[in-house]
Amino acid sequence: NTELIYSDEIGAMVADMGFRTMLAEGAKHVLGWKSPNYVYANAINQKLRLLLRNYKLSDDIAFRFSNRSWDEWPLTADKYVKWLASDETPGEVINLFMDYETFGEHQTADTGIFEFMRALPKAILAKKNDMEFATVSEAAKKYQPVSVLHCPHVMSWADEERDVTAWLGNEVPNEAFSKLYAQKEKVASLKSPDFDYVWSFMQTSDHFYYMATK
């Protein structure tokens, strides 16, 4: 799901498609006082489990790693693991989600990002830390949801607003989006793999992103 776009309704649709777990943003305006470091359940279909991104710890790597004005620079693997294991990071599962472009584009090779990532697994798996890695399925199976997550409005990990205005923030992409999806039944009626292929590519989020003015 692009940029972790999620809402109660989207989660219910995903559950109806047969999925049992979904990734979403641990947005403050949705979580409130709750921690992203637990498994949650969809508000409409509680069979769908949710793993929420710890945006602070994720962005420490994705955006702040090479920022020399950051008061925690330089970030080493040992320092980062101390944060993961700290009492100030309570919970059962810490989800670190970031774009692939973090590695090599946002954080170029000369920042030391690749050396950091090579050192991180060994530091995490040190016995004294009592931590382990888990796949999405493993984490969702191991831990029970602590509560339902209510998210009536669509959220994402994009920008400060944590919404979808990065793609649907003005009349131009909004109109393009509406007209595109208005063709759904017509495209389906054609029963043409070629048209299906083209229509699916027209749904690429970047088309709408580059119409944005924010």
List each model region and its residues:
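A conserved hydrophobic secondary-structure block that centers on an alpha-helix together
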Residues: 1-11
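Conserved beta-strand positions
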Residues: 1-2, 23-24, 98
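Short acidic/polar capping segments at secondary-structure boundaries
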Residues: 3-5, 27-28, 56-58
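Acidic, His- and aromatic-enriched active-site or binding-groove loops in soluble protein domains
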Residues: 11-52
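A generic short-segment signal for beta-strand/edge and adjacent turn/coil regions
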Residues: 18-22, 65, 101-102
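Active-site and substrate-binding clefts of carbohydrate-active enzymes
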Residues: 37-48, 52-55, 60, 67-70, ...
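Active-site glycine- and acidic-residue-rich loops that bind
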Residues: 74
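Active-site/ligand-binding-proximal alpha/beta "capping" segment
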Residues: 77
